[in-house]
Structure formats: structure tokens, C-alpha cells
């Protein structure tokens, strides 16, 4: 059964372009944090469309890795600009769900840019914290920021591979509640 993506807000980049925006993700220097025209999110273990669970901004839904395939997820885009990725790691419905499932510890992010002609991969270490109330340049509303060293244009795909996990207490599979991509930012840090 295929579910459709619910767009929470819509903000205009230009008079002609309207992109979905997650309501509880922080604004960038340009005032927009968007899913950057993400067309779909695909889990590679079974080529399953998981767009609704990853892009709905709802902590009651999550994508859970069913097998250690590489890459775990692919986000298809339509030539967008991407400068950072915001991720809610774990199944964030409540503290019990969060502790039950594995959470990504180290992730590899591959950016396919220049309209699919080039790619680059970065590795990030995520913190293990259930919806922290901290608000900073790297945290907001439970989202952690993965800042790319530069903004990439013509991005057609973002692959995410979970390399290591923080172990959960029972349920199998690493969970991610939500992902958002931000454009029009100026990178000021290197990957952690």
C-alpha cells in the first residue's frame, strides 16, 4: 500500500518554484530548510518506497533497516542544491521505541551531483540522544545537522549507508525517524 507524502509547509525559492518545507526544522541563513524536491526515498534491501515515513516530520513513523544492504537509502532529487542534511536518528515515537531499536552511529553520505556525473562520500558520527531539547547550530527539534563541506548543485541522488549502530534493546534494525535536506547554506565546518 503506497502512502503519499504530506507537505507541511510550502515556501517559494523564487516566484516560479515552490518546495516542501518541514515545519519544525530550523531555518538556514537563507530562511529555508527543505526536502529540496525529493522525489522519493528508496530502501535498497527490497527496493521499497519509504518516502512517507522519512519525510513526514512525524516522530510516530520511522524507516527501519531490514538488512545491511549498501547503500541503505537513496533519496532521488531533481537537480537540487544540497548543503546540509538534517536527520532524526532512531525511532523517536517515545523513549521506549527509541531505546528498543538500533540507532545509526556512523553513516556514510554519498552526494551525486552535477546531474549524476560526479559523486563524493563523507562520513559522520551521530550523537545518541532521544529528541534533545538543545537548540544550536547542530541540533534543533531532535534533528542533528550533517554539514557538508560545500554546497553541491545539480544533486540527483543522496545515498545514506549506516556503517555502525548504537545497539537497541530488542527490535532488529537501525531506525531513522526523519530526514530533511537544506540548500542555500554556506558550509563552515567539515564532517565529523
Q: Which sequence ranges carry the predicted segments?
A:
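Disordered, acidic Ser/Thr/Pro-rich linker "stalks" and the adjacent N-terminal cap
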Residues: 24-76, 99, 187-192
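Bacterial N-terminal signal peptides
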Residues: 10-20
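A short beta-strand element within beta-rich, extracytoplasmic domains
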Residues: 80-99
Amino acid at each position: 500500500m503506497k502512502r503519499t507524502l504530506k507537505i507541511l509547509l510550502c515556501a517559494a525559492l523564487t516566484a516560479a518554484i515552490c518546495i516542501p518545507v518541514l515545519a519544525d526544522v530550523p531555518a538556514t541563513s537563507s530562511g529555508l530548510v527543505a526536502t529540496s524536491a525529493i522525489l522519493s526515498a528508496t530502501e535498497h534491501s527490497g527496493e521499497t518506497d519509504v518516502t512517507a515515513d522519512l519525510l513526514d516530520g512525524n516522530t510516530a513513523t520511522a524507516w527501519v533497516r531490514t538488512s545491511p544492504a549498501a547503500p541503505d537509502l537513496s533519496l532521488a532529487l531533481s537537480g537540487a542544491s544540497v548543503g546540509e542534511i538534517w536527520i532524526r536518528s532512531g525511532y523517536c515515537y517515545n523513549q521506549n521505541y527509541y531505546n528498543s531499536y538500533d540507532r545509526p552511529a556512523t553513516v556514510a553520505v554519498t552526494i551525486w551531483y552535477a546531474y549524476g556525473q560526479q559523486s563524493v562520500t563523507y562520513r559522520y558520527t551521530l550523537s545518541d540522544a532521544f529528541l534533545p531539547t538543545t537548540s544550536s547550530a547542530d541540533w534543533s527539534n531532535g534533528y542533528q545537522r550533517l554539514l557538508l563541506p560545500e554546497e553541491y548543485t545539480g544533486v540527483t541522488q543522496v545515498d545514506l549507508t549506516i556503517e555502525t549502530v548504537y545497539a537497541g534493546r530488542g527490535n532488529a534494525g537501525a531506525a531513522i525517524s526523519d530526514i530533511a535536506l537544506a540548500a542555500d547554506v554556506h558550509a563552515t565546518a567539515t564532517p565529523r
